[in-house]
């Protein structure tokens, strides 16, 4: 994977990848907000793709993410909480398994920060809070076997 960033004007930059390009408009949206959005988009896409591969449907998916950062430089993430809210035609156990599979195995961006950042999550499925402030069960970079689940290509 390769990304090239080129300065356009003032605090605007163009990011080019092999698949396309987009404009980064700082300080309207800061680079750390783009980074956070990328983290959330990675796991959110898994919560669509994993169920789809199991002939299940997810609707009304919203994922909120919040970080606490160092006050001093470098202002890295200390903790990261994800709040998943979605409906599906699966039971609560399967819905929780999709989130865990994304966080523990498939989402490359979350797994990139998990050794240095405390990551927690909550899940509201079909209107019911089924997990609250759960911690990731791994953190040392080890894989967890969830069987055959195909996720969004990174």
Where do the protein language model's features map onto the residues?
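Alpha-helical metal-binding/catalytic segments enriched in His/Glu/Asp
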Residues: 42-43
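Extended beta-strand/beta-hairpin segments
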Residues: 1-37, 48-154
């Amino acid at each position: 994977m390769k990304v090239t960033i080129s300065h356009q004007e003032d605090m605007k930059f163009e990011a080019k990848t092999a698949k396309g390009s987009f404009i980064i408009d700082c300080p309207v949206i800061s680079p750390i907000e783009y980074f956070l959005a990328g983290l959330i988009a990675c796991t959110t896409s898994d919560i669509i793709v994993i169920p789809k591969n199991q002939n299940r449907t997810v609707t009304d998916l919203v994922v909120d993410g919040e970080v606490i950062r160092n006050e001093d430089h470098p202002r890295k993430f200390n903790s990261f909480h994800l709040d998943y809210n979605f409906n599906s035609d699966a039971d609560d156990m399967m819905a929780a398994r999709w989130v865990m599979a994304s966080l523990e195995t498939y989402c490359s961006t979350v797994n990139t920060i998990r050794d240095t950042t405390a990551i927690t999550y909550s899940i509201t499925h079909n209107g019911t809070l089924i997990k609250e402030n759960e911690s990731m069960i791994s953190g040392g970079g080890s894989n967890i076997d969830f069987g055959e689940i195909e996720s969004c290509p990174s």
